[in-house]
Amino acid sequence: MQKAGAGGRRASDCGLAPHRPRCITKFAQYVGLLPCGRPGHPGERVAGAAAAVGAEDCPRRRAVILKFSLQGLKIYSGEGEVLLMAHALRRILYSTWCPADCQFAFVARNPRSPASKFFCHLFVGSQPGEVQILHLLLCRSFQLAYLLQHPEERAQPEPCPGPTGEVPLKPLSSSGGLVREPFGRDQLSQNVHALVSFRRLPAEGLVGSGKELPESEGRARHARLGNPYCSPTLVRKKAIRSKVIRSGAYRGCTYETQLQLSAREAFPAAWEAWPRGPGGHSCLVESEGSLTENIWAFAGISRPCALALLRRDVLGAFLLWPELGASGQWCLSVRTQCGVVPHQVFRNHLGRYCLEHLPAEFPSLEALVENHAVTERSLFCPLDMGRLNPTYEEQDCGPLGRPPRTLRPLSHAKSEAELQGLG
């Protein structure tokens, strides 16, 4: 493998590309990388083992900036000047996170490397929410990339209850614009230095028309909702005065939309090929739920296709979607050694969530999933937060005569694992 120059590559030295895809920027600490086998093979639970060993053997950490897009993941130095690594999405095999250790890890191969040679890259944060969002962004990028490659397998529009089973999602109509929705108290960041962004939801009308609701109507809407958290200035001042802020990042109301805007910009031909109307990409962009719920349900893809992909995923991978025509009921499908096993999840009269034939009750679906991810005897196997990339390619199909683009490795990374460009 060709080594990169010692001087590194600065972002300003890469030249201006004709198109720079939209990306989502996050911060973390890079611990290191370890050679590993393919996830899902017997005895190889890459994420947990590599993360534990990496945390012990690599005490030297480095602050980095991660930039997510539908083309891949780029990692810059803490100052944002030096591009340290770049991973095309098609070369990333697997992503996972460990809330107990505040760790995020993904498994990728190098360009033109053997299909059996992988490296696990480990990152840590100061609290679980910081690393969880890294994992969620990468997983949803996997799914959106698959949807763009296989538009024939998209889900057909059908009425279904929302994430909590209380209010059904409304289809988009044909005129109007976007409105700003106030923040809920549980959506406020615990970080004073975090940027405040509005939650943008579809108004009744044509998405992307750029027309805003009249100011008077917007004020009336906020007054009806009775929520004071509608101004970024007020949100920031109240957070500072309350003195309850902790390190963290804004829980993403807009991450889903940002990823889909990245998809539209990175793959304009595939995006425009999607049909217009209720079943098109506009419904996928604006009418689904949160980032976590979209990943659990593989939002936008048909259920038969989602189940087929689940059968190829790692043991413990799961899908969770609301039952059609039933309020307060969900289907939890888990990939086990016996195949995909479905379980019924319901919400009782106390508003708590239960799994069929099990007495335990949980205040939310997230709590239910987290519990069964660490409990081994409740299901056929514990739930696994990791996800395989359905768009992963074992070989590079680019021009044979094109030399690989190399980048400067991290100072504490092994030379044999120097990372290369997105190419």
From Swiss-Prot:
Keywords: SH2 domain, Synapse. It is found in: Postsynaptic density. Residues 28-146 form the PID domain. It comes from the Eukaryota. Residues 398-410 have a biased composition (Low complexity). Residues 296-392 form the SH2 domain. GO terms for cellular component: postsynaptic density. The keyword Nucleotide-binding does not apply. Residues 394-423 are annotated as: Disordered. Interacts with BCR. May be involved in synaptic plasticity regulation through the control of Rac-GTP levels. This is SH2 domain-containing protein 5. It comes from Pongo abelii.
